């Protein structure tokens, strides 16, 4: 009978999906609405938002294959993972402060690129976290499921603050600042178990010729 209980390393890997999914959900539900509220009157909000998404995708397409290849070498995977998480979290936390569309879009693009970049290294860590190859699918499915469930908690808290904050003297701008901070803290906190408990055991040795 196959072992179904997850190890500390496997649980730590799963938890990062709980953390980053909070930003994914916020990006799809609240961020476009908030962006429309700070965009200049008469501007094409849909076009601007579409450009931002396109730019983020292009940057990711250009950078991630290179970084992914570099991360295969000993000691690099966690460094790149931590760098993308930290930059992404900082940009997420700052999203509530710009009052104009362009600074907001710049922060959003960087946060989105870093989120997706961290996912490249996160997925690469699966082979290091799983106890054996035959557990890869099981651990991955737990990550997907718990990511979906866990992302709802900070999102619901953020939604309540944004929608009902006026009852407590909190306007939408302040509510969104709080929502971005909640999401950033959640994202960062759930990255820590992976950083602490999952180590790169599958890697290429640097032969010094690069």
Locate predicted features.
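Core transmembrane helices of Major Facilitator Superfamily
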Residues: 23, 85, 110-122
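Central cavity-lining transmembrane alpha-helices of secondary-active solute carriers
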Residues: 46-71, 90, 152-155
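Residue-level signature of the transmembrane alpha-helical cores
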Residues: 16, 81-91, 107, 114, ...
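Intracellular loop-helix junctions on the cytosolic face of multi-pass helical membrane proteins
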Residues: 1-12, 93-99, 103-105, 117-210
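Helix-to-coil boundary motifs at intracellular loop junctions of multi-pass secondary transporters
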Residues: 34-39, 73-74, 125-133
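Transmembrane alpha-helical cores of Major Facilitator Superfamily
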Residues: 18, 51-58, 86, 141-149
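C-terminal ends and interior cores of transmembrane alpha-helices
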Residues: 61, 81-102
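Helix-loop boundary and gating motifs at the non-cytosolic
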Residues: 2-57, 101
